[in-house]
């Protein structure tokens, strides 16, 4: 016989949201045994966002790395980190959601990690209100220059971006307190 060994590249994460305030909370336990604690712990389920960039695919697990799959490499080739693309320049390393604008084909990363003060690298820490966008028609170029359309915007209201969606000739992005178009 033969054997097969499988190994995942990215943990699939939880399939449910888990929120708790201690072991044995609820009706289980008596007295202080099984009572709740003032400390809470939450484990977010794994939410993926994916969008087409032409015939290619850009994907992002919420709060994780951004990946790019090139259709011309074939179905047996896996996605690579956006930062590993040929010619990648200051591409975000993390984000909350990815969207491709349908009108002008910018890749948008909602909740991206910002470029550092020196302008030489990404910080690696998510700014929950930052929207970073690539150069038009170029998913690898993220450095804002006078010769391209890459850049970023920070939402002025709210504490985090909740989500975004393409609508008719616009992209809607909402935070916990505002809606942007």
Task: List PLM regions with ranges.
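Hydrophobic or amphipathic alpha-helical targeting/insertion segments
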Residues: 55-80
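Leucine-centric amphipathic alpha-helical interface motifs
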Residues: 5-42
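Beta-propeller and closely related beta-pinwheel folds
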Residues: 29-43, 75-181
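Beta-hairpin (beta-strand-turn-beta-strand) motif
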Residues: 14, 62-63, 112
């Amino acid at each position: 016989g033969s054997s097969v060994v499988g190994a995942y590249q990215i943990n699939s994460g939880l399939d449910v949201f888990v929120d708790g305030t201690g072991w044995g909370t609820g009706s289980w336990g008596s007295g202080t045994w099984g009572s709740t604690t003032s400390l809470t712990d939450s484990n977010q389920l794994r939410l993926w966002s994916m969008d087409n960039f032409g015939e290619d695919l850009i994907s992002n697990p919420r709060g994780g790395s951004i990946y790019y799959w090139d259709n011309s490499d074939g179905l047996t080739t896996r996605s690579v980190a956006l930062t590993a693309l040929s010619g990648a320049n200051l591409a975000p390393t993390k984000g909350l959601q990815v969207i491709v604008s349908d009108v002008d084909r910018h890749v948008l990363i909602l909740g991206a990690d910002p470029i550092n003060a020196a302008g030489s690298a990404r910080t690696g820490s998510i700014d929950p209100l930052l929207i970073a966008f690539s150069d038009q028609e170029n998913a690898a170029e993220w450095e804002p220059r006078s010769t391209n359309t890459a850049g970023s915007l920070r939402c002025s209201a709210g504490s985090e971006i909740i989500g975004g969606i393409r609508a008719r000739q616009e992209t809607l992005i909402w935070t916990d307190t505002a809606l942007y178009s």
